[in-house]
Amino acid sequence: MPAAAQKSAHQSQSATQSTIKVLYGESDENTLSAQAAEMTKAGHHVTTALNRQGVQEALRRDAFDLVILGATLSKDDRHHLPYMVKKSHEGTKVLVMHAGTHHHEVDAAIDPSLSMHRILEKIAALIAATK
């Protein structure tokens, strides 16, 4: 492949994988650190939050493009936190890692048993839809 074509292909690939600010919350530290590391490898700036209180504190400190509520958070947390996200930062997208979420403040849900590759694809699609 000619150098100009390689450069063009690289630019279009990196344009589709733009860096976003993600707040990722879980109740299990091991899950939180492992999943956050994968998101960081994909090029996202990830802030982690442990439990509901951690998510609330992070929302008070900063604004995010996307808030991901992980599967180890309680059902109650996954229900109430989307309201808090939208109230704190109206334009922030909310992705819940739970197969059966139907919530009007949630922008997308994904089954947490899917591979990290599929989760990263869902993140990219959700962000691309807002541009």
Regions found by a protein language model. Give the residues of each.
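A generic structural motif
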Residues: 42-46
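Output/docking surface of receiver
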Residues: 95-131
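CheY-like receiver
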Residues: 41, 57, 83, 87, ...
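Acidic, metal-coordinating helix/loop segments flanking the phosphotransfer/catalytic sites
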Residues: 48-66
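Acidic phosphotransfer microenvironment of two-component signaling modules
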Residues: 29, 50-54, 114-117
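Conserved acidic segment of CheY-like receiver
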Residues: 18-29, 35-39, 67
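Conserved phosphotransfer microenvironments
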Residues: 68-86
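Conserved phosphotransfer cores of two-component systems
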Residues: 60-62, 84-91, 100-101
